[in-house]
Every structure is written in structure tokens, then in C-alpha cells.
């Protein structure tokens, strides 16, 4: 798949999640409308083996970049690339909004995901609970208080028996 077409395909579902990021900062939804002045302008592309993303609002802009994940299985590679590009776009917009407003949300740039899932993923890659919480906190700009809450929740969950294949989880209340 050509770089430009792959990037366009990967970005098809990210628009609503970008709006979630601006909601963290209580920004006017009209900033996404081209008829509103100023309005968000953004562009994502591939170059030099990396994903790039740029957001601008008025005279302020922010650029981000990340590596393009590779995998031998093309289907898994496409999913990982979509995830990486979406994360890059959300983080780049988050950084711009944080600079524009001076606000730092307690959960940082996390939207639409259970934070414990990210901790478990990091632990599956060999990190300790402390290191995993620190990594999630650094990557997503999570406050120290919320990092501690993450650590406490994962610690409590680790005492519970793992689910069997024929069982499912039911969330009654999520403390996030």
C-alpha cells in the first residue's frame, strides 16, 4: 500500500477521538469547523520510515513523530500501525492544547481506554508494576496521584483469580 493511501486509510476513524482530546481542555467544538476562525488544521503523513503529524490553531502549531511498527503478519502490522498513528495524532493534539490552555488533565492524554490495560501491556513486555506505571505516566502525561491509583488497582486485581476461557468480565463501576 502506498504511504499516502495507507496513512489516509489509517486516519479514517481518528476524528471523533481527536474531539475527545479537545473536550479534556473544555475547548469550543466549533474549533473543528472550517467556517470558524481560528479552527484546527491538521495533517498526518509518512516520511523517512516514520509517521508525522502536525496540528495548528491560529499561529500556534505542534509537530509530532513516531516510528512505524513492523510485523511479519500484514493484518497485525496494519492494526499496530493504525494504533500508532492514532496515538501520535492524539498526543500531538494533546500537547498543543496543553500549551494553549495551560491545563494538565489528571489522566493526561488518556481517552477511550482503560488505563490498567496499558499497564498490563507494559508488564507483558517485562516491566515491573512500578516501571509499567511510570512508563504509562510518562508517555501519557498522567499525574502522580493517578499513577498511584493505577498501581493500587493493578495490585488489587493481581490478587484475583484470572478469568477462565468461558468466563467474561462485567464492569459495574470504573474508578476512572
Regions found by a protein language model. Give the residues of each.
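Short, well-ordered secondary-structure micro-motifs within conserved domains or adaptor modules
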Residues: 2, 22-81, 86-89
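Conserved, surface-exposed functional patches that form binding/active-site neighborhoods
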Residues: 85-105
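Short, charged N-terminal beta->alpha structural module
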Residues: 1-28, 143
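N-terminal [4Fe-4S]-dependent radical SAM core
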Residues: 97-104, 124-171
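Generic structural signal for hydrophobic residues
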Residues: 18-22, 93, 132
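Local cysteine-cluster metal-coordination motifs and their immediate loop/turn environment
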Residues: 109, 114, 171-176
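Short gly/ser-rich anion-binding loops that grip negatively charged ligand groups
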Residues: 79, 83, 87, 109, ...
Amino acid at each position: 500500500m502506498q504511504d499516502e493511501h495507507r496513512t489516509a486509510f489509517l486516519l479514517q476513524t481518528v476524528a471523533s477521538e481527536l474531539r475527545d482530546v479537545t473536550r479534556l481542555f473544555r475547548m469550543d467544538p466549533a474549533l473543528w469547523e472550517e467556517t470558524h476562525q481560528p479552527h484546527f488544521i491538521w495533517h498526518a503523513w509518512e516520511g523517512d520510515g516514520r509517521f508525522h503529524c502536525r496540528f495548528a490553531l491560529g499561529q500556534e502549531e505542534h509537530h509530532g513523530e513516531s516510528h512505524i511498527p513492523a510485523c511479519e503478519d500484514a493484518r497485525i502490522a496494519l492494526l499496530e500501525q493504525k494504533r500508532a498513528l492514532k496515538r501520535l495524532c492524539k498526543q500531538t493534539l494533546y500537547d498543543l492544547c496543553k500549551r494553549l490552555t495551560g491545563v494538565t488533565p489528571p489522566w493526561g492524554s488518556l481517552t477511550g481506554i482503560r488505563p490498567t490495560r496499558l499497564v498490563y501491556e507494559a508488564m507483558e513486555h517485562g516491566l515491573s508494576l512500578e516501571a509499567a506505571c511510570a512508563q504509562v505516566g510518562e508517555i501519557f502525561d498522567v499525574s502522580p496521584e493517578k499513577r498511584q491509583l493505577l498501581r493500587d488497582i493493578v495490585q488489587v486485581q493481581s490478587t484475583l483469580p484470572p478469568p477462565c476461557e468461558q468466563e467474561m468480565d462485567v464492569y459495574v463501576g470504573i474508578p476512572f
